[in-house]
């Protein structure tokens, strides 16, 4: 009897150990060239660092194919921060491991590094930043499908992002329903039109290298201008600010407004109807973002477009890791093939 019990215990321990090893995915760091990013006036490399999370069974499964979630990080952030290389409020591989261990369906997670000279690409197409929309939806997706065992169809692809990444997910998602079938927006920034107010600190900057030394909101002005009001004839910044000599510039503000999802969404309603699932959330203490997400919820309701909308007690970052693990990943597990 004792030998039998000991044998069973040994088998249990061995089985547990095997499971512990199996539930940890593998992380790869690759470079994916963007032809549409070549020659950007910021001078950023078109060879972008990309992090790829492969689920635990990927190596051993042989021919199995997996759904893919393309995850976009926020402004001033980088892949190194989101992937746990540098201390940050989130560690994607750890969170995905935990979600899969809790029963969430296995999937591949892909994050391109969109940190640029002006601290963030805004995931927009511009002569100054390069064509980031096309890079994400066309070039990156094509590369991942060619080099990994993916479900190479829109029904197996999701697009998500936080803050600037949430903006990018909606912007790109509205234009590429043939590429993705599910969207999730985490505290998406920049939904509403606006250019703020005159910023004397921004007007005092004439060297691109000085942008990195500026405060967060001044950096955001330059990133937004590079994406939405580029100017190839205005070196060395190659952009137009929405203010000049302390006065707002209506023509530039109009360009910024044209890039606000709440301003452009009406023309993309047929595309949004193509999505199997759309989710979005924001912390109640994250203003004005929570307010604009609520407005987006109202617009989608007006058009009778099915979606999930949730607010929670939190600010812009303090519960993002938890939300990714417990809401976003299960959302895609339920909606992707």
Where do the PLM segments sit?
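Sec-dependent signal peptide recognition
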Residues: 1-7
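Compositionally biased regions
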Residues: 3, 17-18
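N-terminal signal peptide c-region/cleavage motif recognized by signal peptidases
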Residues: 13-15
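Non-catalytic cap/lid and distal C-terminal segments of serine-dependent acyl enzymes
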Residues: 19-337
């Amino acid at each position: 009897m004792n030998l039998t019990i000991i044998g069973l215990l040994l088998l249990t321990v061995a089985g547990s150990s095997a499971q512990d090893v199996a539930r940890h995915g593998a992380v790869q760091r690759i470079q994916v060239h963007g032809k549409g990013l070549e020659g950007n006036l910021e001078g950023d490399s078109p060879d972008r660092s990309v992090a790829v999370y492969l689920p635990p069974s990927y190596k051993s499964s042989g021919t199995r194919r997996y759904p893919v979630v393309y995850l976009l990080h926020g402004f001033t952030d980088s892949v190194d921060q989101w992937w746990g290389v540098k201390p940050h409020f989130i560690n994607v591989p750890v969170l995905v491991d935990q979600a899969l261990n809790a029963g969430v369906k296995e999937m591949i997670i892909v994050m391109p590094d969109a940190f640029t000279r002006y601290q963030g690409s805004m995931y927009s197409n511009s002569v100054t930043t390069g064509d980031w929309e096309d890079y994400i939806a066309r070039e990156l997706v094509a590369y991942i499908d060619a080099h990994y065992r993916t479900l190479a169809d829109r029904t197996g692809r999701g697009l998500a992002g936080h803050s600037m990444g949430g903006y990018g997910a909606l912007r790109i998602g509205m234009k590429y329903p043939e590429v993705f079938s599910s969207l999730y927006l985490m505290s998406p920034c920049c939904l509403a039109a606006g250019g703020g107010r005159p910023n004397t600190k921004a007007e005092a900057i004439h060297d691109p290298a000085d942008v990195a030394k500026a405060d967060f909101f001044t950096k955001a002005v330059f990133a937004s201008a590079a994406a939405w009001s580029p100017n190839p004839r205005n070196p060395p910044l190659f952009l137009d600010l929405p203010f000049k000599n302390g006065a707002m510039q209506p023509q530039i503000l109009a360009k910024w407004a044209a890039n606000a999802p709440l301003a452009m969404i009406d023309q993309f309603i047929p595309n949004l109807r193509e999505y199997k699932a759309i989710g979005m959330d924001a912390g109640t203490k994250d203003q004005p973002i929570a307010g604009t997400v609520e407005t987006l919820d109202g617009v989608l309701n007006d058009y009778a477009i099915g979606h999930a909308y949730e607010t929670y007690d939190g600010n812009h970052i303090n519960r993002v890791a938890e939300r990714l693990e417990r809401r976003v990943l299960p959302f895609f597990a339920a909606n992707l093939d």
